[in-house]
């Protein structure tokens, strides 16, 4: 019996033309941080890969990623922790290629962060249950890292804005840390005077500061906290999860002054020593951030540009190294090919009582 004739196929008909291959971005440049100095095309896309290391306090040169042993005071009044027992926020500024030779034009280009892939590094290191840990029982393995854990990261065109909230307003924080100034009992719930920018790595204790939800219009942040005495860390490992950084208008963080800011905290829990003392354990975080060029209305008048030459407006961040000999930028990729917004979300625009459009610098 002859095979059944396929529907729609005529004898002697010419074979169908195969579909054209799907168009994808063409890899133009690939390399280290020096690629960021290369001038790119109009439609180029840039990918930056970097990592942030934990700021746990570092008990000594052999225990990087661990805090000093945590002690507990008997009274609220005498609470005075040491700096090496306080996990702090990690942050860094990544310089991006300069896009505009002429800043007097009506429209300018800005880098816009579109997506980020991120992952905690070293998750499997916590499977080591034989290195001076307290035994579960006399003949057992060591007690694993467990307890309260906090995982957080942010990507933005400006430094992360923070709100101070304290567990005990009478706590005396050590030199080298930045805590809310002049705390009162209201600081334990909400004091709107406790505002700050995350402008220095390893200086802002996590227990004092949270991301400010009323601000950070030009930053996207994500975090989870799990509290408890015996809570195990739950972490995922994958290179397929992508976080979109666009808002409801389809606009991502705009990198002001060609600067990208990343921040992270990854506290996995408490490590219990054989003596019974405990230390915070932190891990590093990897980032892969995709950026595209966005045409925006020039928000900077000539008078502002001239004054900015004297009073540099760009926030200075003392972060982890992202350029130089010890740069933590792993890889930069630039794509060139297939592929009226206000350029400064911090500027206030309004119509005054005379019907005139006004712009106010905050």
Swiss-Prot record:
Annotated positions of the Phosphothreonine modification: 338
Molecular function terms from GO: structural molecule activity
Motif (Bipartite nuclear localization signal): 5-19
Keywords: Capsid protein, Disulfide bond, Host nucleus, Host-virus interaction, Late protein, Phosphoprotein, T=7 icosahedral capsid protein, Viral attachment to host cell, Viral penetration into host cytoplasm, Virion, Virus endocytosis by host, Virus entry into host cell
Cellular compartment(s): Virion; Host nucleus
GO biological process: endocytosis involved in viral entry into host cell; virion attachment to host cell
Key word Disulfide bond present: yes
Keyword hit for Phosphoprotein: yes
InterPro entries (UniProt xref): Capsid_VP1_Polyomavir, dsDNA_vir_gr_I_capsid, Polyomavir_VP1_sf
Stored SUPFAM superfamilies: Group I dsDNA viruses
GO CC field: host cell nucleus; T=7 icosahedral viral capsid
Role of this protein: Forms an icosahedral capsid with a T=7 symmetry and a 40 nm diameter. The capsid is composed of 72 pentamers linked to each other by disulfide bonds and associated with VP2 or VP3 proteins. Interacts with sialic acids on the cell surface to provide virion attachment to target cell. Once attached, the virion is internalized by endocytosis and traffics to the endoplasmic reticulum. Inside the endoplasmic reticulum, the protein folding machinery isomerizes VP1 interpentamer disulfide bonds, thereby triggering initial uncoating.
Domain comment as written in the entry: A DNA-binding domain overlapping a bipartite nuclear localization signal is present in the N-terminal region of the protein and is required for efficient virus formation.
Oligomer and partners: Homomultimer; disulfide-linked. The virus capsid is composed of 72 icosahedral units, each one composed of five disulfide-linked copies of VP1. Interacts with minor capsid proteins VP2 and VP3.
Homology family: Belongs to the polyomaviruses coat protein VP1 family.
Protein name per the record: Major capsid protein VP1
